[in-house]
Swiss-Prot record:
Pfam families: MMR_HSR1, MnmE_helical, TrmE_N. The lineage of its organism: Bacteria, Pseudomonadati, Pseudomonadota, Gammaproteobacteria, Pasteurellales. SUPFAM superfamilies: P-loop containing nucleoside triphosphate hydrolases, TrmE connector domain. Homodimer. Heterotetramer of two MnmE and two MnmG subunits. GTP binds at residues 224-229, 243-249, 268-271. It comes from Haemophilus ducreyi (strain 35000HP / ATCC 700724). It is found in: Cytoplasm. GO terms for molecular function: GTP binding; GTPase activity; metal ion binding. GO terms for cellular component: cytosol. This is tRNA modification GTPase MnmE. Its cofactor is K(+). The keyword Cytoplasm applies.
Length: 452
């Protein structure tokens, strides 16, 4: 017999309302034992919740959803009572005294919904993304994914790939036909259409991934260059202590903001120099740990101390230690003191921005540059939200399509084209969960809240 699961659906702790969710074949039995009544599906009942001996534990609203018309596709019971944690724990213990009921694993309700075809894998992930959204744009985009906008685009691509694959395999199976199906141009035209449509979905998915993941920007530089002042200017508040004493910042400071909806994780680090102080050495090592893991490095220079053209020589060792292809922007700070004109220029292959973190002159230029460098495009409408695994799958599918195009146009190798199309179909289907591994499912649902 299939197991019945139960969990608290509201956050742990004190609140106005607390909800317990039960899903599985014993949901009706739970209702009968706790409420003493058979519930009418989809109708709110205001009833007392009783203990084993009939003592009232709480009173609230009970809702019953009959399979398959529920979130999980199973019988579901929701008990909505007062949000005191002691009350909820007592009610949970009471439910667990019924044989055949256990505590749900993290994400198990959503997993059951996926397994019962109530939603696909991309939609299930969107539930977690909607809960974790840190901006209005991210929330709206996650909701679009939950409603199936991303999945629909993927399913349309898969359908076209299946159609083309069928056509190619038919051409292979009937080689004696008078028409050369591989050379008549129809397959290539259809293949090109799929390639172009996939490129459009990849671009939209990239925007969705930026909206979800954001950018990790690390501010690096010598002591007293103005790193903490820049952190405060970008954050719009006094997040870091600022003094004229070099080495004030000895640890890593994190600040999370949004640039037109794009999450930006700004990290202020200890000044980079030869240090004899053991505490400062630890701070510098932590700074390097953040620098090598960054999406973007902001190298902060004091414009009153050195020429703009001297940075490659002065910072040659620093630049050599950066990971290959690490995006780096040179910040010439304190232009209010040096007299330099604020703005963005290109210098020796680097983007250089002149600004004053203290007066905030030129800080808006930096904000726009950070958005542009990530390829983020602000939009009031927004698209769907995407994860890194989605981007990887789309990239892999694009490579197989490109390889398939080569097999068709250069070698007229129908069998190899058909194989590439099969791989495209499987790769795209991993996004929605039509073709996926149990390990992937476990990794995805284990990141959910326990009551979801």
């Amino acid at each position: 017999m299939k197991e019945t699961i139960v969990a608290q659906a509201t956050p742990i702790g004190r609140g106005g309302v607390g909800i317990l969710r039960v899903s599985g074949p014993l949901a009706q039995q739970v209702a009968q034992e706790i409420l003493g009544k058979t519930l009418t599906p989809r109708l709110a009942h205001y009833l007392p919740f009783k203990d084993n001996d009939g003592e009232i534990l709480d009173q609230g609203i009970a809702l019953f959803f009959k399979a398959p018309n529920s979130f999980t596709g199973e019988d579901v019971l929701e008990l909505q009572g007062h949000g005191g944690q002691v009350i909820l724990d007592l009610l949970l213990k009471r439910i667990l005294t019924i044989n055949g009921i256990r505590i749900a694993r993290t994400g198990e309700f959503s997993e059951q919904a996926f397994l019962n075809d109530k939603l696909d894998l991309a939609q299930a992930e969107a539930i977690a993304d909607l809960i974790d959204a840190t901006s209005e744009q991210a929330a709206r985009s996650a909701l679009k994914s939950l409603q199936g906008e991303f999945s629909n685009k993927i399913n349309q691509l898969v359908d076209q790939v299946i159609y083309l694959r069928t056509y190619v395999e038919a051409a292979i199976d009937f080689p004696d036909e008078e028409i050369d199906f591989l050379a008549d141009g129809k397959i290539e035209r259809h293949l090109n259409d799929i390639i172009h449509q996939l490129a459009a979905v990849r671009q939209e998915a990239k925007q969705g991934s930026i909206l979800r993941e954001g950018m990790k920007a690390v501010i690096a530089g010598r002591p007293n260059a103005g790193k903490s002042s820049l952190l405060n200017a970008l954050a719009g508040r006094e997040a870091a202590i600022v003094t004229n004493i070099a080495g004030t910042t000895r640890d890593v400071l994190h600040e999370h903001i949004h640039l037109d909806g794009m999450p930006l994780h700004i990290i202020d680090t200890a000044g980079l120099r030869e240090a004899s102080d053991e505490v400062e050495k630890i701070g510098i090592q932590r700074a390097w740990n953040e620098i090598v893991a960054a999406d973007h490095v902001l190298l902060m220079l004091d414009s009153t101390e050195q020429s703009a053209y001297a940075f490659k020589t002065e910072w040659a060792e620093f630049l050599a230690k950066l990971p290959p292809k690490m995006p780096i922007t040179i910040i010439r700070n304190k232009v209010d003191l040096s007299g330099e004109v604020e703005g963005l220029t290109q210098l020796d292959g680097f983007t250089l921005i002149r600004l004053s973190a203290q007066t905030k002159i030129g800080v808006d230029v930096l904000r726009e540059h950070l958005k542009t460098s990530m390829g983020y495009q602000s939009s009031t409408e927004g698209g769907f939200l995407a994860r890194r695994r989605h981007l990887q799958a789309l990239e892999t599918a694009a490579k197989h399509l490109t390889q398939g195009h080569i097999q068709l146009t250069q070698f007229f190798a129908g069998e190899l084209l058909a194989e590439e199309l099969r791989l495209v179909q499987n790769t795209l289907s991993e996004i929605t969960g039509q073709f996926t591994s149990d390990d992937l499912l476990g990794n995805i649902f284990s990141s959910f809240c326990i009551g979801k």
